Regions:
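Conserved active-site segment of CheY-like receiver
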Residues: 10, 85-89, 108-110
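Two-component/phosphorelay signaling modules centered on CheY-like receiver
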Residues: 12-32
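Acidic, metal-coordinating helix/loop segments flanking the phosphotransfer/catalytic sites
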Residues: 33-51
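Conserved phosphotransfer cores of two-component systems
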Residues: 45-47, 72-80, 100
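Two-component signal transduction core modules
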Residues: 52, 82, 105-106
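Active-site residues of response regulator receiver
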Residues: 55-56, 86
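Short amphipathic alpha-helix used as the core "switch/output" element in two-component signaling
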Residues: 63-79, 95
Length: 156
């Protein structure tokens, strides 16, 4: 079975590249594209899909983007697996994105090979963080251990 995937990003080149990687890898087929949070919510309401690959920030959208958009998706489509593409270097925001119900997070500078792996993991319900983001998170964690009181934060 080929996964039905919706792509959302405000940059046409990113959508074109994401579609090309998804379809050439054989991991799924793109059944719809959106360039804003508003278009995404309308598309999700009308087009069945198995997984969403979305940008975090789509400025200029009449509806909210970022956390507000994720919240709307989680409320209206609670079982939809979400993989987020991001250029953010803010580890606090990235952690909050994952805490909000996004299962996968891929840095837009990641290798093209990583996207199909991330899609497969997220569809199976497994969390996925791209290598480059994982390395940054680990580096920040080890820095905090050296600079802090030596006690890691407890899980929530």
């Amino acid at each position: 079975m080929s996964l039905r995937i919706i792509i959302a990003d405000d940059h046409p080149v990113v959508r074109i590249g994401t579609r090309a990687v998804i379809e050439s890898s054989g991991v799924g087929r793109v059944v719809g594209e959106a360039d804003s949070a508003q278009a995404l919510m309308a598309l999700l309401g009308s087009q069945p899909c198995d997984l969403l690959v979305t940008d975090y920030s789509m400025p200029g959208s009449p509806q909210a983007d970022g956390f507000a958009m994720i919240g709307m998706i989680r409320r209206r489509f609670p079982d939809l697996p979400v993989l987020m593409l991001s250029v953010s270097n803010n580890l606090a925001i990235l952690r909050m994105v994952l805490d909000s119900g996004v299962l996968g997070l891929v840095d837009k500078s990641s290798s093209m090979d990583e996207l199909p792996q991330a899609i497969q993991a997220v569809y199976r319900g497994q969390p996925y963080i791209s290598r480059s983001l994982r390395e940054r998170v680990e580096a920040a964690g080890s820095w905090r251990m050296r600079e802090g009181d030596g006690k890691p934060l407890s899980p929530r």
